[in-house]
Amino acid sequence: MMWPMHTPLLLLTALMVAVAGSASAQSRTLAGGIHATDLNDKSVQCALDFAISEYNKVINKDEYYSRPLQVMAAYQQIVGGVNYYFNVKFGRTTCTKSQPNLDNCPFNDQPKLKEEEFCSFQINEVPWEDKISILNYKCRKV
């Protein structure tokens, strides 16, 4: 069977277009690259809830519960699991940590008791092993 002379050229052109298209898609989301993520995503929200819980259990030495005033940034990175990066501004509430229901605690508005803190968290989740942990955090008073 004899192929027309332009057939190899067409195949080569098609291959080059396919490779260029896939390289373009890869440049937008690199494996291991950090990119902004959606706070409404269930797994992102679970990682953020974990960071907030650990903040109040381990990092926040105050007797009052703190909750987020604002999540300023959220990123994720696919590694051997998922790394989540959060920048969160916390506010002190009127509820002490010993109270049973802390979800609806109002923020403390009294000047002497009002306190805010900015924290950056790196959370690692390995879903298939059911593991989640804080790899790194840094907090400062605002």
Curated annotation (Swiss-Prot):
- A Gene Ontology cellular-component term: extracellular region
Where is this protein found? Secreted
Output the Gene Ontology terms for molecular function.
cysteine-type endopeptidase inhibitor activity
What SMART domains does the entry give? CY
Per UniProt, the keywords (alphabetical) are: Disulfide bond, Protease inhibitor, Secreted, Signal, Thiol protease inhibitor
Its family? Answer: Belongs to the cystatin family.
Assembly description = Monomer.
Quote the protein name from its UniProt record.
Cystatin-D
User: What organism does this protein naturally occur in?
Assistant: Homo sapiens
Q: Which gene encodes it?
A: CST5
